[in-house]
Amino acid sequence: MGRKFFVGGNWKCNGTVSQVETIVNTLNAGQIASPDVVEVVVSPPYVFLPTVKDKLRPEIQVAAQNCWVKKGGAFTGEVSAEMLVNLGIPWVILGHSERRSLLAESSEFVGEKVAYALAQGLKVIACVGETLEQREAGSTMEVVAEQTKAIADKIKDWTNVVVAYEPVWAIGTGKVASPAQAQEVHANLRDWLKTNVSPEVAESTRIIYGGSVTGASCKELAAQPDVDGFLVGGASLKPEFIDIINAATVKSA
């Protein structure tokens, strides 16, 4: 069976009660491809998770944007994987480049978080990606492989993992990796999984692209053989997110 297209919407630290209501209403009213064709997950800030989960159409799932690396306790400001499970939140985004850079989360720490979240029953969108300096130095694959290895070292079962390749230089900048650039990294990542994890994991694991994906760029990116979907930032707050979801039909055509 082929890899089902996956579209995640990362709302980041955005939204008010009324804005969230507008986004949810837009998604509920939108004509989107069937769940047989595309899996859709949106990730609002923690405070809006229960509201969005309750009001959003059932075929769109909800993700947290982060969770703590171990069981809850004296960790002020953190949210544990167990809390998310208790709320019925099925997904979590881990290792986003903004947390790696702004909060100094190391690859090893991200690997530990992924392993713990999976062990509690969450599904994980695990993010990897290089900076502009790293790309210009020709070390893209070295960086992405190191980040992926830190996850592979901690987990054995990849069933509930989606890998998101996010070139950091393309996040929020309006710059998009060309379809060829995205395909090259995705194919190399899949080869890395084949060699270092297993051919089965390489074949079944979805590798999605994140980095200024828009309604204008999504179809050409979706047509690439190793691009299995998107992790969308700013555009996931806008009506064009519907168009990005529907880029999944390029794969099923």
Swiss-Prot record:
Return any one Pfam family short name.
Answer: TIM
Keyword Flavoprotein tagged = no
Q: Which Enzyme Commission number(s) are on file for it? A: 5.3.1.1
Active-site annotation = 96 (electrophile), 166 (proton acceptor)
Q: Where in the cell is it found?
A: Cytoplasm
One GO cellular component assignment for this chain's record is: cytosol
**Enzyme class, broadest EC rank:** isomerase
Q: Which GO terms describe its molecular function?
A: triose-phosphate isomerase activity
For this UniProt record, the keywords arranged alphabetically read as follows: Cytoplasm, Gluconeogenesis, Glycolysis, Isomerase
Q: Which reaction does it catalyse?
A: D-glyceraldehyde 3-phosphate = dihydroxyacetone phosphate
Please verify whether the record's keywords include Cytoplasm: yes
- Binding sites annotated in the UniProt record for substrate: 10, 12
**Biochemical pathway:** Carbohydrate biosynthesis; gluconeogenesis; Carbohydrate degradation; glycolysis; D-glyceraldehyde 3-phosphate from glycerone phosphate: step 1/1
Record-linked InterPro entries = Aldolase_TIM, TIM_sf, TrioseP_Isoase_bac/euk, Triosephosphate_isomerase, Triosephosphate_isomerase_AS
UniProt xrefs under Gene3D superfamilies: Aldolase class I
Q: Which GO terms describe its biological process?
A: gluconeogenesis; glyceraldehyde-3-phosphate biosynthetic process; glycerol catabolic process; glycolytic process
Q: Which NCBIfam families match?
A: tim
What the record says about family reads:
Belongs to the triosephosphate isomerase family.
According to the record's subunit comment, the protein's assembly and interactions are: Homodimer.
State the remark under miscellaneous.
Answer: In plants, there are two types of TPIS, cytosolic and plastid.
User: What protein name is recorded for this chain?
Assistant: Triosephosphate isomerase, cytosolic
What is the native source organism of this protein? Secale cereale
